[in-house]
Amino acid sequence: MVYKFDPVDFNGTTFHLDRASGMVKGSTQFTGQNLPIPASYFPKSLTFDAASAKLPDMFHMSRGYFIFSERARAVIEDWAPGQVEFIPVACHAQPRIAATLNFDSAYYFVNVLGRAQRLRWREIPSNKYPTQRDGLELLGLTHDFHKWKLRERAPGEPLIWHDTPWQDGNKKYLGQDNVLVEDVLWQELDANFPDQLHPLRAGED
């Protein structure tokens, strides 16, 4: 059983970041090639200028860019050592806002290092992108994660990963934008941090 990793909270729900808290332009050149984003592309600090609740342990800075607390880092390091890079980020807020957020001892941007090719592309719907000049057809995942199908995890494969692009003749299938999590790790995160993850179970209606 596999889940699409998706924290419930992001900038604009329980908190709001200032305008300077953004990724350096150019980071998409790495995600497009299914490569980890170099640490130098991440902001060194985040400034919170509003808050309505305690800061969660896992959240989006913006869609697709995740931040973990020290507590969440410890769970990942225990269950999936070496599969995630944690890039420290300093968090700042005025005293009143900081009191609401109740900061943990440290926060980190998350670079998911795990890679595996587990999507069963021939059995699932896909979106077609413009054909390349060399005739290569590019296809990607639909947003309907209920229809995604994945093979079983092989021994030694990561518990949290980006799926590796797969080529079949002149067709190349791309699903690396999503972070996928094996059930055992997702359940551990959910147990430690209840109601912080959307239960987006792949392949089940």
Language model regions located:
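Phosphate/anion-contacting hairpin/loop surfaces
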Residues: 1-205
